[in-house]
């Protein structure tokens, strides 16, 4: 016996699932006489045909004639319940995960849309004869191997060295104590097998219940189905069920029949739930055939096809063996109806719970889809309204553009008529433009002359301004001189007042001196008279007594002589006073004459300054008036020049335009 590798298939959800499902249902009656699990490995057949044959084999495993009525009714209810939800699931636009079972642990996985037939992973299905360590080793090795499955050697048990690790080695069953079991199935095993189970039964029980530990009940049903298929088909390939002991084979077949019925119930339920689950689960059960079947199919797929008739004969023999096994399984199923009913009821409860969950999820998805559709409808209505508004606006714009087009056409026609009418007028205007151009040239010449005059006037204005500045400077200098003269005149008046005061004082002194002089004259006269008398009295004694008598003069003579000396001194003093008075008078007269001269000069200078100031003021007023007149003339000239330049610019542009017109006409 030789082992064969399983084909790993990546299955995604696609819209073609419903079509493929219906196609398998239509083709299933035609291929009832063939073995689906073996024929699916033959090259030259499509994946769709392989799936159809897998579904036929799963349908054959059941016993519809001997099944109780309760199973049929419950199965019909499940089918109708799940089929009623097909429209809901198929109508949703979202991506739906379809449930299928893995060949190792029975977990749910997502199904891919495109069926890629390439070999992504070299995976080996778990058989009851394989050990846990061998499985782990084979998984680690097969995870890194890619490509087509290795070729098998026709001799049983002899494999090539390079392929030895990638294939499942046929080994004997090892008794393994199961850890956790489903209560109903454990009851079946203990009741039928008892404590003395064979190696194949214990390994089947381990595979049947080992994967159910630590995962939901929903996954247990799928794992039971796959394990049942792999256990029954692979066991019959190596040794038929009839070769095992009766008690042990009965127990193992009972377990297989239970797992087969549960697998088909779950298969029917999930096939109605989603179009992909039936095909995926059937595709998963394909690798669980017998070793002999897999060896023949691997030969057919790995090597070129030798002869189709030989393969068909082999397949018919295998099919007969399977029918015998199925007959025995049906007999065992009749014996274990009560246990199967209990298991089926539990399965039905789980299915109802799943159905309720699916209904709730479906209602939620339908609600979300309805809300989404409502939002999309509102958005579309809003877009339609906006498009209608834009359409109305575009229609209005189009009508306005048509009206504008008509108006423009009318205006173009009127312009053409005016052009035909204005042709002769244009000629006249051209001649007038020529005349105006001559006038403009004259005006330009006049403008140049006026500009020259303006430049001359501006030079004169500059000269007048410079003269005005000089006159202003002279006026300031003369004003400063007048101010100085006024200051000097003021000082002179003060000096004259001082001199007048001094003169008055001198006059007063002179009056006092005159009075003194008159008094002194009187005293001198009295003294003269006394002196004359004394002289007359003393002459008589002069000759008689010359010197010696002088010594003996009397006091009266001494007094007289002293009075005479004093009188002489007074006379001299009076003479001196008279001389001083005369000098003072002469000096006073000279000062008065000098003051009069200065006064006359100051008056003359004052009159000159006044006349000069009056003349400067008159000149300043005249200059101011002239400046005002010049500024007025300059403003008028600037205004005239600006107007002429503007007119010249307009006429120059018009002249160029009309000259271009005449040139183009010529």
UniProtKB/Swiss-Prot annotation:
GO biological process, one term: spindle midzone assembly
Record flagged with keyword Cell cycle: yes
Protein name: Leucine zipper putative tumor suppressor 2 homolog
GO terms under cellular component: centrosome; cytoplasm; microtubule; midbody
Family named by the database record: Belongs to the LZTS2 family.
Lineage: superkingdom: Eukaryota
Key words of the record: Cell cycle, Cell division, Coiled coil, Cytoplasm, Cytoskeleton, Microtubule, Mitosis, Wnt signaling pathway
InterPro entries given in the database record: LZTS, LZTS2
Function: Negative regulator of katanin-mediated microtubule severing and release from the centrosome. Required for central spindle formation and the completion of cytokinesis. Negative regulator of the Wnt signaling pathway. Represses beta-catenin-mediated transcriptional activation by promoting the nuclear exclusion of beta-catenin.
Segments forming a coiled coil: 305-647
Organism, scientific name: Xenopus laevis
